[in-house]
A protein has these predicted regions:
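Helix-centered, glycine/charged polyanion-binding patches within enzymatic domains
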Residues: 64-153
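A generic structural signal for residues located within well-ordered alpha-helices
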Residues: 47, 128, 155-158
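Charged alpha-helix within mobile-element recombinases
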Residues: 139-140, 156-167
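Polybasic low-complexity intrinsically disordered regions
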Residues: 1-104, 161-164, 171-174
Length: 174
């Protein structure tokens, strides 16, 4: 394959304005051991919640036999993801979710009749586990080029993330 035709470069080079200035956001999905399963690179102004379905659609994990797995059994996410659209998408695809609700959503649901608010003890125990995704990000950002986004093009930054994630897979005990 020709290096000039290797992939479409986004028009904004995955650099967008956010509170801290021009920045890039990496959206990733990892397994329980903190190994990257899929990731996307977008501009800094893109909300995490809008990229959940797109990021989950990138998962492809090869097994011993058959076609690769493309869906997790369960998704554990933080308070940035509890939108109705995300929960509906997860239900449609048969993915169980553990996503705590934000305080403003809980207060809104208390004012309205309907399903009671219950995060449940089993959900709390499941969510209480170590923050694996944050540690995965920290492990990837030990590479200075990824932490500082020293690449001009998004595809080069994406390739650096891919290399760091691969090395992380190789050094993590299975």
């Amino acid at each position: 394959m020709n290096y000039k035709k290797s992939g479409a470069e986004p028009a904004d080079h995955a650099i967008g304005r956010s509170r801290g200035g021009l920045t890039t956001k990496s959206h990733l999905v990892c397994d329980g051991k903190g190994r990257v399963l899929a990731f996307l690179v977008t501009g800094g102004q893109v909300a995490d919640t809008s990229m959940l379905a797109t990021t989950l659609e990138q998962i492809s994990v090869a097994g011993a036999r058959g076609r690769p797995r493309t869906r997790p059994d369960r998704l554990i996410a933080d308070k940035g993801y509890p939108s109705k659209a995300n929960r509906a998408w997860l239900r449609r695809h048969g993915i169980a979710a553990t996503i705590p609700e934000r305080a403003d959503q809980i207060a809104h649901r208390r004012r309205r009749p309907g399903r009671p608010i219950d995060f449940g003890e089993d959900q709390r125990q499941r969510y209480r586990g170590p923050n694996v995704v944050e540690r995965c990000f920290n492990r990837l950002k030990q590479w200075r080029g990824i932490a500082m986004r020293s690449d001009k093009y998004a595809r080069n930054y994406h390739a650096g993330l891919c290399l760091a994630a691969t090395l992380h897979w190789l050094t993590t005990t299975l």
